[in-house]
Amino acid sequence: ATSAAQGAALDESVRKVLKP
């Protein structure tokens, strides 16, 4: 997996936490 892919996945998870 590439760093970009991991970053995108983390961003999506964080967005779910910030915007429930």
From Swiss-Prot:
**Misc:** On the 2D-gel the determined pI of this unknown protein is: 6.5, its MW is: 30.8 kDa.
Q: Where is this region: Disordered?
A: 1-20
In Swiss-Prot or TrEMBL terms, this protein is called: Unknown protein NF009 from 2D-PAGE
